[in-house]
């Protein structure tokens, strides 16, 4: 139920390591604000969707995808709790999100990554994403994949 999602996400992000928060939000946040949580809960299910992954009844990963109005491009941001990394959860979640985006006719799926987030970049490469510099910012890369023509 959506009324349960706010507290669930708040508890999840309280268990996410500081480096993983930095990689997810591309900033030096130490915690996730109520406004950020609200944006993850109050999705429109048309241009934005938040996918949740559970293990043994606990939330262990979340993946937010947001598309432009034309559904030409969508951006995805995923975070997996540290104690559940290296189990294929991020890989599976990204694959599921890519299939969802493809089913909506979205042509390109992208993610902006911190250049040091090599684990995420490697997962994205494994799933056929290409990596390019992000504008003039040497600390970031854009990872993208064409889903349909």
What would you call each of these model-derived segments?
Residues 20-28:
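A short, aromatic/hydrophobic, helix- or strand-capping loop or linear motif
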Residues 27-75, 81, 148:
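Acetyl-CoA-dependent GNAT
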Residues 80, 86-103, 118, 122-126:
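Conserved acetyl-CoA-binding loop-helix of GNAT-fold acetyltransferases
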Residues 100-113:
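Conserved GNAT acetyl-CoA-binding A-motif
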Residues 125-134:
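Conserved acetyl-CoA-binding loop of GNAT-fold acetyltransferases
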Residues 134-149:
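C-terminal "cap" of GNAT-fold acetyltransferases
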């Amino acid at each position: 139920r959506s009324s349960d999602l706010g507290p669930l996400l708040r508890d999840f992000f309280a268990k996410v390591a500081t480096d993983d928060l930095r990689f997810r939000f591309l900033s030096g946040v130490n915690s996730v604000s109520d406004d950020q949580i609200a944006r993850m809960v109050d999705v429109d299910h048309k241009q934005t969707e938040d996918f949740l992954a559970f293990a043994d009844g606990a939330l262990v990963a979340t993946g937010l995808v947001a598309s432009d109005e034309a559904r030409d491009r969508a951006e995805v941001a995923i975070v997996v709790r540290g104690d559940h990394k290296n189990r294929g959860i991020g890989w599976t979640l990204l694959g599921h999100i890519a299939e969802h985006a493809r089913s909506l006719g979205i042509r390109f799926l992208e993610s902006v990554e911190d250049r040091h987030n090599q684990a995420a970049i490697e997962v994205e490469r494994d799933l056929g994403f290409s990596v390019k510099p992000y504008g003039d910012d040497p600390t970031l890369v854009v990872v993208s994949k064409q889903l349909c023509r």
